[in-house]
């Protein structure tokens, strides 16, 4: 479908929701689905593309919700004024938490996000500012040009316009230069850094972007429900949002929307059916979601969206116009035979093992030189030291008169030193 067709479809859905023939139950469910989809879109960037698992997105949603709740009820600010403040609060929290948490990776990062998610939940439950576990009631409704949007049917359009904005911004981000750096975080971090990508910055940007979308979702949630308390922003909610991304397809924008629809519907039905089947009250749907996540990871690790798209008719490829691109600018090349790279006393120790010992060599521009040695001689370690993947225990590296000793991979790549790998890395 073309962009105009999608726009017409979206406008039609918004108008359809205003008709009284559509039951209020389905409008409420669609509103929750839209808010959940915004959070899941952040997880597409953070987890599906960036490879960083987070169980704390509901907490950032809570920052946005509580910010607007406090400012509209206590300070009397307009909800529209609190919208950027809610997103800013989530960003500020993500900046502080990310500065500490993003030093970790893999399951350590996931465990860290669980820890501060639980901590923030209990903190919100004991502070007078947040109304303790009772929360903050009587949040004013959003109004547009003097027209109140207190009715969920009227607020439907605001939510799904925000979903559309989130989809477009996510797609544009992933297609940008920053997006390519974020893609390099998953499985190709070393190769990306060696090509000049600032991956530490990319990790933080992905974390902040996901938090910003969660803050937006929190603002929408607060003015939809007109009350907030810690429960919707705890660890179980974060698990559900992660399940939405995984179930639909964590690396796909459409997967976030599909996952939000499926999990929201399943959650509503399971909360009604399971107590009758089991004969007891409890959050049994959490157990079902846990089992469902394991099954999806085993049977469809890429999610359901890629499988669904294979069943749909493919669009005919558009003809791409031929464009003449101007040549890229090139840096000044050194004169053949001029000094280029000088290594003096380069040493790398791993505890008591010396992998590289007092290596000295000198290269001039235009030379082709090979480094030859048996397995374990330190060839790969030498290349790692020269390209900033590893740091030398002693010695200096000078390139075109500039000391690069201790510089990281992106900085060295920007100076003009590139490398290849023994295994293919894209």
List the predicted regions and their residue ranges.
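Conserved Walker
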Residues: 380-381
